[in-house]
Amino acid sequence: MTAFGVEPYGQPKYLEIAGKRMAYIDEGKGDAIVFQHGNPTSSYLWRNIMPHLEGLGRLVACDLIGMGASDKLSPSGPDRYSYGEQRDFLFALWDTLDLGDHVVLVLHDWGSALGFDWANQHRDRVQGIAFMEAIVTPMTWADWPPAVRGVFQGFRSPQGEPMALEHNIFVERVLPGAILRQLSDEEMNHYRRPFVNGGEDRRPTLSWPRNLPIDGEPAEVVALVNEYRSWLEETDMPKLFINAEPGAIITGRIRDYVRSWPNQTEITVPGVHFVQEDSPEEIGAAIAQFVRQLRSAAGV
């Protein structure tokens, strides 16, 4: 039976980016293996996966701006924490961390859009990409599971503010609802901590669903996703697709599409969306094997 550790992995470190303090984990030595979370999580999501990669490289996991232990933006409002603003902060942090030229990316949720985008811009610096429950193509509402479609349509309406900023729906309902097991109180409190204060401190959890590329909107995010997916569907960059069963956002036609990408290995693990909380051992072992194969092929 899988043991689900509750303690964070590693020791948090901090760097100032554009006047704001950003938190990250940076453990071990060697070529970088970069783990990137999405909404509404943090580097805490990777706590039971990163130990499987010890000894295989430098393990880096950053908290997005306004999330985890990173600072909040001020003043805040509906125009803050857009994809573009999140990207500017994260890419500046990655640049400051000097990740080197043999990066392996491990991506989930919005961390996948950010990582795919970065990889597309730095193709000669990425050795391979592992991804799960990722944003791989623009979507339509028909692609969304009926059980959550209404909630996400609500986030993208004027009701989004009370849903997310007052009632903390993304943390209190969406997160636990997309995990097969029940998180402990201690685990939930780690995820609650960045958003314990109501109002604008919770803005990132609302801006992210409003940035999802659904039915052609927002146009700039749709264009960006089309740009990186056009590259991913033709590049021989080694890929590891960690398929979730039953899954949430990579299902049906989108799963079929992802399976067309070249030079890709696939494993299937139990999970809905936050698969790291249901299958950390299987995911960690698969990524470790993937990295060993990449390093061996590169003669490292």
Curated annotation (Swiss-Prot):
EC number annotated for this UniProt entry: 3.8.1.5
InterPro entries: AB_hydrolase_1 (IPR000073), AB_hydrolase_fold (IPR029058), Epox_hydrolase-like (IPR000639), Haloalkane_dehalogenase_2 (IPR023594)
Pfam families recorded: Abhydrolase_1
MF terms in GO: haloalkane dehalogenase activity
Catalytic residues (positions): 109, 133, 273
Statement: the UniProt record of this protein carries the keyword Hydrolase: yes
Keywords, in A-Z order: Hydrolase
All copies of domain AB hydrolase-1, residue ranges: 32-155
Coiled coil: none
Catalytic activity: 1-haloalkane + H2O = a halide anion + a primary alcohol + H(+)
Domain of life, per lineage: Bacteria
Keyword tRNA processing: no
SUPFAM superfamilies linked: alpha/beta-Hydrolases
Biological role: Catalyzes hydrolytic cleavage of carbon-halogen bonds in halogenated aliphatic compounds, leading to the formation of the corresponding primary alcohols, halide ions and protons.
HAMAP family for the chain: Haloalk_dehal_type2
Subunit relationships: Monomer.
Family under the similarity heading: Belongs to the haloalkane dehalogenase family. Type 2 subfamily.
NCBIfam families in the cross-refs: PRK03592.1 (NF002938)
Name by which UniProt lists this protein: Haloalkane dehalogenase
Underlying gene: dhaA
